[in-house]
């Protein structure tokens, strides 16, 4: 996967209200959503707070992310994250009928079409029958993975 890296883990989406200094020098309270790789809700909150060290921050919510796989791009133009829903297609061994398994990915890309192209690239290399069901933009600002930070 040239320029792409898949990372599997247990992810949490953490929403926080953060006081940040704007370009004009004014301070403003903004809501941000970050993704944290963690073992529990408490661990996710602790890691998010550590990343916001030095800021006035309140954690608003912590929820289990609907994905276990994050697809990162090394392209500097890929500055957003998208959720992509995919259905894997396989025959049911007992009935022989088509069986579909839904999976959600978080994909770093510059556009919706590029996110879907990245999914296609990964799935073709995996040689799995699939269909892309949906893709939507997210408000994710950053992904914190065991010592690494992917900022947008």
What do these predicted regions represent?
Residues 1-3, 61-74, 137-147:
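Short amphipathic beta-strand and strand-loop transition segments with alternating hydrophobic
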Residues 4-29, 76-100:
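Short aromatic-glycine-(Arg/Gly/Cys) micro-motifs in beta-strand/loop hairpins
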Residues 10-16, 33-35, 44, 48, ...:
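Short, structured motif recognition centered on aromatic/hydrophobic residues
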Residues 20-36, 46, 54, 97-105, ...:
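A cross-kingdom feature marking solvent-exposed beta-strand/loop segments within repeated
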Residues 40-53, 111-127:
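A short, charged, amphipathic alpha-helix used as a generic interaction element across diverse proteins
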Residues 53-63, 125-134:
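Short loop-to-beta-strand transition segments
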Residues 61-125:
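Short, solvent-exposed interaction modules
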Residues 126-152:
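Glycine-rich, aromatic-bearing surface loops/beta-hairpins
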